[in-house]
Amino acid sequence: TIMDPYTGNIVAMVGAVGPKTQNLVDNYAVQKHQVGSSIKPLTVYSAALDAGAVTPATTFDNYPVHLLNGNPWPKNSPNTYTGWTMIGEGVRRSINTIAVQTLEALGVADSYAYATEKLGLSLVPEDMGVAPLAMGGLTYGLSTVEMAAAFSSFANSGVYNSPKMYTEVRDSNGEVVLKNEGETHAAMKETTAYFMNQMLTS
């Protein structure tokens, strides 16, 4: 899914590739999928930055900070741990231990509220936990349309535009009978969007 971040217009969407083989099949672009670590900038880093829980210069010790069934958790992929690490490096390398500690500095409830209310993500109450929000193991997942709209807030200086599949409907006389205005709101501070863009492109 490709979205114009300034208008919310969906300009391209691919649901499947190759020849059509049957009718009434699922549209993969709007169906929910597991999003994995791609959720971290949305539910963890931008949320924590915007709330002032961390700054881009905040450091955490890159190691498993909890025990889960007697085993160190979370684990990184690859299974390497490098000591004190800045947030930006955690974003760049998608480090699980840094994401978990950043989320815990913010709080699970605040992360969930930010993601659902500010970024329009259709999370469910069962997703209100450290593992789903920090590493993306969601109950039902998210669609590529939702993800495109949320990430577009970074490109649009922190302003969220709801995704629009059409702009207007006209009748046979060319008169507009339905106009899709969409919904726009400030999802985050402009400085938060700036820092996220810097970290995601470094």
Question: Model features per residue range: what roles?
Answer:
Residues 2-19, 49-53, 65, 83, ...:
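Glycine-rich, acidic and aromatic/proline-enriched surface loops and short helix-turn segments
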Residues 22-31, 96, 128-135, 181-182:
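Glycine- and acidic
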Residues 53-111, 160, 172-201:
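Conserved catalytic neighborhood of penicillin-recognizing serine enzymes
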Residues 72-76, 107-149:
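Mid-domain, small-residue-enriched loop/turn segments at the edges of structured enzyme/sensor domains
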